[in-house]
């Protein structure tokens, strides 16, 4: 039977994809995304924004509940567990980034861990069930972004995870819970009415809510569809539907499942080595290279007093152009700050964005010397952008270095061991060593897991009586910096 609309072809894909459609490459890449998302989520549970959203969410209760990651004695209704865990994943802007531009995992993974725990079934949810639903949620996001030329660039008007992430969440939940094709279509339609958040809230405590809301609202859309709520049957076909988010929206029917090719097989994600906007990673890479001209065995400190001018040649991305950031969230979205901190310190780490680091007098003085240039051959795309840094000394000497690809970008991916080390450094903030290592083992063999409760039990973290043991084991980790990556 011919499918009648783009919307129905999406519902058909969500409903029709099976475990045997998963390729070895898809399983491998998605397990890396899951491990990284869990790690940055555990780290994010220590942030101020996470504390605020958990305090808010405590007013809700339900007969069914799910784990808040790393909090064994704190459970929430599944929609709110997905919300706060999604906020945790994006609370420090440390989560994965895709092309076209979005953060794909944070709106999907918290939904699936919450559902697998809150709605047990027979047979039980398996690791393959989770991997399939996760990849369906990622695939829907990617397919939607490919309908717009605008989506290929770094966003200017709205934050993509708040839009495509909401539909990815609904798709993943619909697949996980086995909804019919018709119910999958309704879940997408309902999710569109929950979607969207302006990019103006980037660099604030509100930005992480975009991911949390996408997770929560996609799950809500799925529950409402299960209860029979209906929406526009052509929501993805219409300029007044999903096309309202894009000026140049041009949707197309999806290929048949017989010829299905996963977008993640064709386009990997980027993993970050420090918690800041992805575009700043090119800046840090170029700054580290130019610093080698100025910091030598004979001169161990960066000669800030000798600097006349620092020029950054980068794309024109207004919300990452912050000459004098006043907060950790602004610093994470500042080309200028990341350049100066990299030059002064030699590397960027989690504490680089603490307020006392951001407001150092040496940093503020160096920021005054930074100028931005936007070369016409450097458009704002995570696939093609570059950063060139030129430093001119007061004696007229100039040093220039350029980064086209940083370590962690999909063209230069993190090794599996470095990804594990990032996870260890992040997750050890909340978990004892044994739990950290057990999670690595479980995620890396997720396709063999017969019961997802093995995973969700580990996500709870230590019980109260285990706290002393946890604190003892944490003493062997360095929590102030991420491990030095071996392939840089």
From Swiss-Prot:
Enzyme class, broadest EC rank: lyase
Catalytic reaction list: cis-aconitate + H(+) = itaconate + CO2
Activity vs pH: Optimum pH is 7.0.
Keyword list, A-Z: Antimicrobial, Immunity, Inflammatory response, Innate immunity, Lyase, Mitochondrion
Disulphide linkage map: none
EC assignment: 4.1.1.6
Pfam families from the UniProt entry: MmgE_PrpD_C, MmgE_PrpD_N
Domain of life where this protein originates: Eukaryota
Compartments, record wording: Mitochondrion
Gene Ontology molecular function: aconitate decarboxylase activity; protein homodimerization activity
GO cellular component annotations of the record: mitochondrion
Expression across tissues: Expressed in LPS-tolerized macrophages (at protein level). Expressed in the luminal epithelial cells of pregnant uterus. Expressed in microglia and macrophage cells.
Induction cue: Up-regulated after lipopolysaccharide (LPS) stimulation. Up-regulated in LPS-tolerized macrophage by LPS. Up-regulated synergistically by pro-inflammatory cytokines TNF and IFNG. Up-regulated by pro-inflammatory cytokines IL1B and IFNB1. Up-regulated by progesterone and at the time of the embryo implantation. Expression is activated by IRF1 in neurons in response to flavivirus infection in neurons.
GO BP: any one term: cellular response to progesterone stimulus
Family under the similarity heading: Belongs to the PrpD family.
Known function: Cis-aconitate decarboxylase that catalyzes production of itaconate and is involved in the inhibition of the inflammatory response. Acts as a negative regulator of the Toll-like receptors (TLRs)-mediated inflammatory innate response by stimulating the tumor necrosis factor alpha-induced protein TNFAIP3 expression via reactive oxygen species (ROS) in LPS-tolerized macrophages.
Family matches, as PANTHER family: 2-METHYLCITRATE DEHYDRATASE-RELATED, CIS-ACONITATE DECARBOXYLASE
Assembly and interaction partners: Homodimer.
Full protein name: Cis-aconitate decarboxylase
Source organism of this protein record: Mus musculus (Mouse)
Taxonomy of the source species: Eukaryota, Metazoa, Chordata, Craniata, Vertebrata
